[in-house]
């Protein structure tokens, strides 16, 4: 059967959609492999998923406003392109599918230089730098958003965001995570690598909001730490329904820093890494970054979000992603540059049952189950359009 190579890497937002689509194509009888950065997290994920992996060097390119490119990164990018050309010329795949991010670029550009058909998947609401470099010669682009800034809509097909479409029964997930049934569960997650900002700010914010006992404030409680109208919709009459518990995935590198901050709060559970399916299956509210993978998983599980976009994200794509979710009524955007008190207010407002229910309904409407299957359909359409030309053997100059 035909071989399809997924060019991906860098972050989970690029890698996991590739893995989901790879599994779908493999189920249809295709041979599938991943190509990404040597030693990158994609290599370990491919191994765990039983996917063949081809590693190449990958260099980060400077974006507009970032100054001149680093010559060392340009050298790595050139080396990676040559390595990818040699590998793909030997494999002669039917197509290469690019998922964005600097680690995908060598595979996609090498395929295009060899005449191998390329298809792209754009996960964000704004076309990324690496995708802009490849889009002109790509056969088609599957998108996670109905409108993508910088992408000709005639070349785009809305397929959604391929994610792990798995759920756990709530009781089973709570038990696996060591959480109780009953309290509102707030999940804090900074993406596949964690978030320094969320790790530094959120524990203090949640302690100020919910105190040592872990309860939302109600009538008769002491003056709240921020200026809120106590007659507002955030008030909760039933004391039991005011209980909260937190599941905070810090990322392995920051676990030791965060743990001491919350060790006296029995309702605040910290872990370096968490099983995402279990976490999303119990979350009633998420405090997260705004990578498209995170937003797609939130929609699939119907979890409302308070989103703090990563300001350094490529082309500020996380902000544009988050705005689209907020406009749909499924979350609230709080920019990192604002005062922590603003984040406190938004979290408390979104924790209220009525607000959470409305946001949950909006999140579920955003979900597009079956995205991996739809993108696989698009790939198959392009494979049937014309046979893959035979890749030429690399020359001495390649």
UniProtKB/Swiss-Prot annotation:
UniProt subcellular location: Cell membrane
| InterPro entries linked to this entry | GlcNAc_MurG, Glyco_trans_28_C, GlycoTrans_28_N
> Pathway of this protein?
Cell wall biogenesis; peptidoglycan biosynthesis
What Gene3D superfamilies does its record include? Glycogen Phosphorylase B
Amino acids binding UDP-N-acetyl-alpha-D-glucosamine: 11-13, 124, 164, 192, 318
Q: Which residues form a coiled coil?
A: none
Q: Which GO terms describe its molecular function?
A: glycosyltransferase activity; UDP-N-acetyl-D-glucosamine:N-acetylmuramoyl-L-alanyl-D-glutamyl-meso-2,6-diaminopimelyl-D-alanyl-D-alanine-diphosphoundecaprenol 4-beta-N-acetylglucosaminlytransferase activity; undecaprenyldiphospho-muramoylpentapeptide beta-N-acetylglucosaminyltransferase activity
Q: Which residues form the signal peptide?
A: none
Give the matching CDD domains: GT28_MurG
Q: Quote the EC number.
A: 2.4.1.227
Read off the SUPFAM superfamilies from this record: UDP-Glycosyltransferase/glycogen phosphorylase
Q: What does this protein do?
A: Cell wall formation. Catalyzes the transfer of a GlcNAc subunit on undecaprenyl-pyrophosphoryl-MurNAc-pentapeptide (lipid intermediate I) to form undecaprenyl-pyrophosphoryl-MurNAc-(pentapeptide)GlcNAc (lipid intermediate II).
Family in the record: Belongs to the glycosyltransferase 28 family. MurG subfamily.
Q: What is this protein called?
A: UDP-N-acetylglucosamine--N-acetylmuramyl-(pentapeptide) pyrophosphoryl-undecaprenol N-acetylglucosamine transferase
Native organism is Deinococcus radiodurans (strain ATCC 13939 / DSM 20539 / JCM 16871 / CCUG 27074 / LMG 4051 / NBRC 15346 / NCIMB 9279 / VKM B-1422 / R1)
> Which gene is annotated as encoding this protein in its UniProt record?
murG
